[in-house]
Amino acid sequence: MTSLPLGVKVEDSAFGKPAGGGSGQSPSSAAATAAAVGADEEGAKPKVSPSLLPFSVEALMADHRKPGAKESSLAASESAQAAGGLAQPLGVPPGSLGAPDAPSSPRPLGHFSVGGLLKLPEDALVKAESPEKPERTPWMQSPRFSPPPARRLSPPACTLRKHKTNRKPRTPFTTAQLLALERKFRQKQYLSIAERAEFSSSLSLTETQVKIWFQNRRAKAKRLQEAELEKLKMAAKPMLPPAAFGLSFPLGGPAAVAAAAGASLYGASGPFQRAALPVAPVGLYTAHVGYSMYHLT
């Protein structure tokens, strides 16, 4: 508590003269007193060790100047693991091999280093691969990330035509009935009511069955007749001559054309024949001339 007035007194004696006329202290004694006051003030302040400030300039410079500290700590941890003889395989937490209830401690940084991997047994480095059950990470097994299994598309069901509920089942005709119906149709395609009743009773059929059979047989005969007429039309239809396309060749094809050109150039075949001027076939330009005359008129 006496340092403050002492400091004031020192300041007055150091930088100025005292107010009174008494003799002041000497400069050497004033400097010593100021140094003692500064030391007391520094001792009163709380001192912070550099270790408590990891981001201070001193701590950063110390880490930068000593790069071998981490390597020495890693080597020490590796040697401790080798001495203990408890090399843990990859992917196994440290507490799983020991007591199951013990809390798992964080892995050292040198656990996956080159030296640690070389010291591990081969069984720990090589995983057993089974084609039946491939290993998957937990995030791949979750349905959120793994794609859904492919669904097998069943073939579409064949939709059949639905018949009427009151439809009567089809009655098959016997061979004798079919022969009699066909013979009667060749004789007469249209039957009267009396003829149909008599004919149906002789075949043990109803009049409706005979009537429907004759209708279907007439439709079939009509289709066959139209097909025959179409064939006859195609057979009787003449092929378009080459003159329709602007070209006309004599009968015999290209071979006859070549022979005619050779005969017109060298005359008739035989010895001692003079060469004659080539004469074009008569019908070669007939179509072109007619086409031009038609447009000129």
UniProtKB/Swiss-Prot annotation:
Q: Which InterPro entries match?
A: HD, HD_metazoa, Homeobox_CS, Homeodomain-like_sf, Msh_Homeobox_Regulators
Q: Which UniProt keywords apply?
A: Developmental protein, DNA-binding, Homeobox, Isopeptide bond, Nucleus, Repressor, Transcription, Transcription regulation, Ubl conjugation
Q: How does it assemble?
A: Interacts with CREBBP/CBP, TBP and SP1; interaction with these transcription activators may inhibit autoinactivation. Interacts (via C-terminus) with PIAS1 (via N-terminus); the interaction is required for the localization of both proteins to the nuclear periphery and specific binding of MSX1 to the core enhancer region in target gene promoters. Interacts with H1-5.
The keyword DNA-binding belongs to this UniProt entry's keyword annotation: yes
DNA-binding region(s) in UniProt: 166-225
Position(s) of the covalent cross-link Glycyl lysine isopeptide (Lys-Gly) (interchain with G-Cter in SUMO)?
9, 127
Provide GO CC annotations from the record.
Answer: nuclear periphery
Region annotation Disordered: where it falls in the sequence: 1-51, 63-111, 127-157
Listed Low complexity bias regions:
25-38, 71-95
Q: Tell me, what does this protein do in biology?
A: Acts as a transcriptional repressor. Capable of transcription autoinactivation. Binds to the consensus sequence 5'-C/GTAAT-3' in downstream activin regulatory elements (DARE) in the gene promoter, thereby repressing the transcription of CGA/alpha-GSU and GNRHR. Represses transcription of myoblast differentiation factors. Binds to core enhancer regions in target gene promoters of myoblast differentiation factors with binding specificity facilitated by interaction with PIAS1.
Query: Which compartments does it reside in?
Result: Nucleus
Instruction: Name the source organism.
Output: Leontopithecus rosalia (Golden lion tamarin)
Name it. Answer: Homeobox protein MSX-1
